[in-house]
Amino acid sequence: MISQIDKAELLERFLHYVSFHTQSKPNAKHSPSSVGQMKLAMQLQKELIQLGLENVEVSKYAVVTAFLPANDPNLTKTIGLVAHLDTSPQCSGKNVRPEVIEEYRGGDIALGIGEEFISPVYYSFMQKLVGQTLIVTDGTTLLGADNKAGIAEIMTALSILQKENIPHCNIRVAFTPDEEIGLGIHYFPMEKFSCDWAYTIDGGEVGELEYENFNAATAKVRFFGRNIHTGYAKGKMLNALTLACEFQQVFPVDEVPEKTDGKAGFYHLEDFSGDIEQVELTYLIRDFDEQNFAQRKAFIKNQVEKFNAKKGLKKPIELEIQDSYQNMYDVVKNVPQSIELADRAMKAVGIKPNHKPIRGGTDGAFLASKGLACPNIFTGGYNFHSKHELVSLQGMENTVQVIIEMLKCKDL
């Protein structure tokens, strides 16, 4: 088990990291998309050097890489650890003011002095956290446990390995920018991250082990109208807003995020913006199955063609579809040791592994597309991307324990 001193160190690290404003910016054309990410990258570079890691570098894109050689000649594997610097653009990450609740007693938790609260009535998992130390928000921002809990856990595990001289394999570490907007990983220096397999430390509840994720794409549908003074609009105005609303009705009403779970895919209208003359709809397309994923993209294309044929518009609606990431399972299944090692590590520290698909994506999906198996490990956090985000300190301890156990590389 981790000592009390290390528990305090873990909490201190986490609280320090969330003080950095690293919210990524949607539609950014360069990485990092925010200055705070580079500031955190430089801080982590300094700490990694202090911990004795080698080849510690920060690229101009704010990708941090480092290496810790094995201290046992019998441990020849190289394992990678990955976490991301940025926080979600879906909720403010500026001026995060965490609140620490010692020995949560159950019931509602008031957040700050406003009207926000979190309740086991809405979040049943809170019943499992009674007696634990919880870190919550003040109700005005997200917390940043996604993914600064993962960063703190990796750094604390490295610190313990070094202080206690625990036998370990070769370790590569990477901290990446702009994971939340799918941008930073495209600047990832694979040549500096040569390893047998890796893990993103970017999951949620204790025990989660994830190695399947959505295939993902984004579709943008643009509508063009014609504006005329409303008093004289009859037979002349063409309202792009009305066209967009009509088009939205063609989608299956039950194939949306709020009505699907498990391995069910969906269409998600993420953004509706514009005016009478021009509107853009942004859809997220998600599915675990590659064939179903292709069919979903074809469905939107066909609906656009039908809509244009039906309306006979002078300027037809336009469609742009861009793939975001692929299901990592096709790569991970060929490296079963990556799953077996995580399984054994969890069981060794008394945690029951919970294999589940990721209804989202991680940097591991991109790394898998480059041939590197990269399952995802829990962080102990919940309610990511929201003011109700929280993390359990005991859950974070569990993650550190699992990381250390994995890096011992027993029976490999």
UniProtKB/Swiss-Prot annotation:
Residue positions binding Zn(2+) 2: D146, E180, H385
Superkingdom of source: Bacteria
Biological process terms in GO annotation: peptide catabolic process; proteolysis
InterPro entries registered for this protein in UniProt: ArgE/DapE_CS (IPR001261), Bact_exopeptidase_dim_dom (IPR036264), Peptidase_M20 (IPR002933), Peptidase_M20_dimer (IPR011650), Peptidase_M20B (IPR010161)
Role, per record: Cleaves the N-terminal amino acid of tripeptides.
Recorded family membership: Belongs to the peptidase M20B family.
Protein name: Peptidase T
Biological source species: Haemophilus influenzae (strain 86-028NP)
GN (gene name): pepT
